[in-house]
């Protein structure tokens, strides 16, 4: 069974939703990209992002700078000053703050460009653009990037567009692995990893609902087990139930479970059935939900379309249950409209 076939442009759109940067989708003309894989798209978007930031003016910040200078400025480094006999010449080794472009965000961007340039299968035009941008950042140092560098920027003062560019950097860095040639990289085959794509699919659908279903409230709900024990310690061992998506409209509470599988069906003794564990999980969520004012409650299992388009609706144990697919292989405006139609139908 093949995995869902999703064009790389649509994977980029899904990433942009998952990162929370819906507005930036419109700023990248993906039709103009010379390459044809996800790395080429991300490299193209990064180049355009760095160019736009440079035109706006890269962010500045005060950074400690140590120099041999005439007189005194800031803090004197006494040991270095005495050891170098600088006082004999009326000079000191001083450390003082200097306003420049050598900030953490800019270092991350330049360091990512350095990695991008060394990718073995990157489109040559995109590589040349990245190399040109790298050379235009001489006052910015590079880093051996780690997850901690990106975590330092979370919630920082960077502008929204800076944060978008950093998100692209983070994805490129996290999916760059050593290539066959020393000092080079190859891009991890992200879209072929079912676990990674499943996480992306869940995040994408959550952000889509949160941003596009403006008349409803989209959250992730934490549900409590209807359980008792002789000790609180025993209860604490129970796993936490968290929904992928909970949508509350004026008419209904809809719990959505996003499942990214090679097939929506399991086969046993020659007969196709929906995956039982998915339906059991959804039903458990519904049984655990405690409506406060007699709200109408329903559930929806939504899969990517692989080989069969599915749209079914049932009444199970008094709950309105839907199982459907969305075709992620079509043009993006069609995906957008299909999802709106699905949620509009199942929220009624």
Swiss-Prot record:
| Superkingdom per UniProt | Bacteria
UniProt entry tagged with the keyword DNA repair: no
UniProt GO BP: DNA restriction-modification system
Query: Which protein are we looking at?
Result: Type IV methyl-directed restriction enzyme EcoKMcrBC
In Gene Ontology terms, what is one molecular function of this protein? type IV site-specific deoxyribonuclease activity
What is one cellular component GO term in this UniProt entry?
Answer: endonuclease complex
State the taxonomy lineage.
Bacteria, Pseudomonadati, Pseudomonadota, Gammaproteobacteria, Enterobacterales
Q: Which Pfam families match?
A: McrBC
Alphabetized, the UniProt keywords read:
Restriction system
The protein's job, in short, is: Modifies the specificity of McrB restriction by expanding the range of modified sequences restricted. Does not bind to DNA.
Is Ligase found in the keyword set?
no
């Amino acid at each position: 069974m093949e995995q869902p076939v999703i064009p790389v442009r649509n994977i980029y759109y899904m990433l942009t939703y998952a990162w929370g940067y819906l507005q930036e989708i419109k700023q990248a003309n993906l039709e103009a990209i010379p390459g044809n894989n996800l790395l080429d798209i991300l490299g193209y978007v990064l180049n355009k992002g760095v160019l736009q930031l440079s035109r706006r003016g890269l962010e500045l910040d005060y950074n400690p700078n140590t120099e041999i200078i005439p007189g005194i400025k800031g803090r004197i480094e006494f040991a270095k000053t005495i050891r170098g006999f600088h006082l004999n010449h009326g000079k000191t080794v001083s450390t003082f703050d200097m306003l420049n472009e050598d900030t953490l965000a800019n270092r991350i961007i330049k360091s990512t460009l350095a990695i991008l340039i060394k990718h073995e299968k990157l489109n040559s035009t995109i590589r040349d653009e990245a190399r040109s941008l790298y050379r235009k950042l001489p006052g910015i140092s590079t880093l051996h990037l780690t997850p901690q560098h990106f975590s330092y920027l979370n919630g920082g003062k960077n502008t929204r567009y800076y944060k978008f560019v950093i998100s692209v950097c983070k994805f490129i860095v996290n999916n760059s692995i050593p290539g066959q040639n020393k000092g080079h990289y190859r891009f991890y085959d992200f879209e072929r990893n079912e676990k990674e794509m499943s996480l992306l699919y869940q995040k994408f659908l959550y952000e889509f609902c949160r941003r596009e279903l403006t008349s409803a409230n989209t959250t992730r709900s934490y549900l409590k087990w209807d359980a008792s024990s002789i000790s609180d310690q025993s209860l604490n061992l129970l796993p936490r139930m968290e929904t992928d998506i909970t949508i509350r409209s004026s008419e209904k509470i809809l719990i959505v479970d996003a499942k990214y599988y090679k097939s929506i069906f399991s086969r046993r003794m020659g007969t196709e059935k929906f995956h039982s564990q998915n339906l059991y999980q959804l039903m458990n969520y519904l049984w655990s939900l405690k409506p406060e004012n007699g709200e109408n409650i329903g559930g929806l299992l939504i899969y990517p379309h692989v080989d069969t388009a599915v749209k079914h609706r049932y009444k199970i144990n008094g709950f309105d249950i839907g199982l459907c697919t969305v075709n992620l292989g079509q043009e993006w405006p069609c995906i957008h409209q299909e999802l709106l139609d699905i949620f509009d139908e199942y929220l009624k």
